């Protein structure tokens, strides 16, 4: 469980998240090509070539970004330019409804994500290149792990159509 809190005495933009990497096969087990992912989302935030939100949204139907059913990463990774580094807008659901999941058939481990946040930044380690040492000195290569970062809309302060992330 990850639980954050913030307090301020003035209006302050706040968008707390965590950039923890996971590989459900364990440390030093290669890439995440054998993982299945699901996210309860029908839209994502569009970004420019520098991965900065443009303020636009894109429907996911019929695209490799549609992860409403568990999808094997290796079956769609070649359809994406680099993998995922995208903010998925979560569907409104009842409290206690699972917002996302990851599963490895190899290990049998399933990770479930529940959040009160509006979305998830889903990242598949596209820029991991083996230069940074992780646990036990293992060097993680491209797609060596994934992140599911629950948070409010990224860059909301610059887009009037996005829900505000300002703490009052």
What are these regions (language model features)?
Residues 1-168:
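An exposed, glycine/acidic-rich loop-and-rim segment of catalytic or binding clefts
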């Amino acid at each position: 469980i990850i639980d954050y809190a913030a307090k301020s005495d003035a209006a302050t933009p706040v968008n707390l998240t965590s950039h923890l990497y996971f590989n459900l096969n364990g440390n030093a087990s290669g890439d995440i090509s054998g993982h299945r992912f699901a996210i309860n989302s029908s839209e994502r935030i569009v970004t420019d070539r520098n991965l900065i939100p443009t303020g636009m949204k894109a429907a996911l139907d019929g695209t490799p970004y549609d992860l409403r059913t568990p999808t094997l990463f290796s079956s769609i990774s070649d359809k994406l330019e680099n993998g995922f580094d995208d903010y998925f807008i979560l569907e409104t659901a009842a409290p206690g409804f699972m917002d996302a999941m990851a599963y490895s058939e190899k290990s049998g481990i399933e990770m479930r994500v529940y959040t009160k946040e509006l979305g998830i930044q889903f990242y598949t380690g596209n820029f991991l290149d083996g230069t940074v040492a992780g646990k036990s000195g293992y060097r993680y290569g491209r797609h060596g792990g994934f992140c599911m970062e629950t948070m409010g809309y990224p860059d909301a302060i610059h887009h009037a159509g996005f829900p505000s992330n300002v703490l009052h």
